Amino acid sequence: MIELEKIKYFKYLLFSSLYFSQGLLMAVGFVLVPLYFVEQGISPAITSIIIGIALLPSIIKFIWGGIVDYFIHLGRKKFIILGVMLLSGSLIIITFIQPSVALIPFTFFLLLSVCGWIFLDVSADAWAIDVSNEENRGKINGSMHAGQYIGMAFGSLFLGFIAKEWGYNISFLIAGLFILLIIVLPLLTKESIKTKKRQKMMPKIIEEFKKKDTKLVSALSTFAFISRGMLIVVIPLFLNIYLKLDVAQVGLIVAIFTISSAIGALICGALTDKWGRKKALYIFFGISLILTLGIIITNTWLIFTIIYALIGFLQGGYLAAVTALYMDTTDPKIGATQFSIYSSFGNFGLTGGQTVSGSLVTLFGFSLTFFLAALMFAPALIVLYFINLKKGNKK
């Protein structure tokens, strides 16, 4: 068995591979499934409802975290393996289900794959908290999110090619088998289980969320990702409607953005360990605000691509820094629960940004929408100012 303490860089490979599998599922769910449904004659309205149903487990992520923490005496690795098996198995099963004929079974197993993803996600986060410290959490989070971005890019390009050449069913099968292979790394890794009995969860959760910094980090989590959510929806529309780019050109620019985000997560994750969380986030948020405003004056695809790639680089950076801050302020005994609560606040901000952005474009146009997306970093910077990391945390 491999001991994480003895092989210095193995933990980065382990956690990046686990997040790579999540990136593959995101490519399947957000790229392949919608296109597959179009091919099957299923309307966009039904498609969005099905994807929304499948994503329901992610909205109550803290419940899955609570389950993992309640059974802390079993360790984190068992739940990671359970998540991988559930995720992989569900994707393999939907290979044999035609949604135009059996939409409900297809939806059920797609939802089951997301359940596996969430189990994998909260368990991997908790394990990372257990085996990391403030000196390397930026690098660990950077490697995790880089793995996720690479998984999304790989899934969109490679699985998209497979779907085009041999059909969507084969692409789902290959995605499931790829994810199943990832189970090898956690199986080979030795886990040190420090708590040998079940624990009472609620008193610890209440105690943690009475703390001022915990409340402020929750607020920061919400504000930090609103702009990101807005850009996810608005950018493809901007490229198609304003810059007159076709689907292939939009896909290429999005791929460049994804690769830039992966690089940013790795480099900026290391920088946040060196500079400290607050200083790094001031820089990442501040420059992101300026660059988002810069989109307003963009009138060519080349200038836009450069600005958008830089925004992606910084998005990867502040994602790594914010999640490192989550870990710094999380009690390891309720690591899965507290981290997933922070993440739920982040998902709320992300989803809120996605939800309102289309309406903002319709009502006010692209320029004002980009201005508002940039402005969303202002409350994040204000909340960050009031976070007073205690001695032992990165400042």
Describe the function of each predicted region:
Residues 2-58, 215-216, 220, 224-239:
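Helix-loop boundary and gating motifs at the non-cytosolic
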Residues 96-109, 296-308:
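Helix-loop junctions at membrane interfaces in 12-TM secondary transporters
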Residues 333-362:
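A late C-terminal transmembrane helix in Major Facilitator Superfamily
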Residues 44-45, 134-143, 247-248, 332-342:
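Loop-to-transmembrane helix entry/capping segments in MFS-fold secondary transporters
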Residues 118-132, 317-331:
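Intracellular juxtamembrane helix-capping segments at the cytosolic ends
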Residues 1-9, 191-219:
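Juxtamembrane intracellular "pre-TM" segments in multi-pass secondary transporters
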Residues 60-74, 163, 264-276, 361-362:
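Helix-to-loop junctions at the C-terminal end of transmembrane segments
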Residues 78-93, 279-294:
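Structural signature of the two symmetry-related core transmembrane helices
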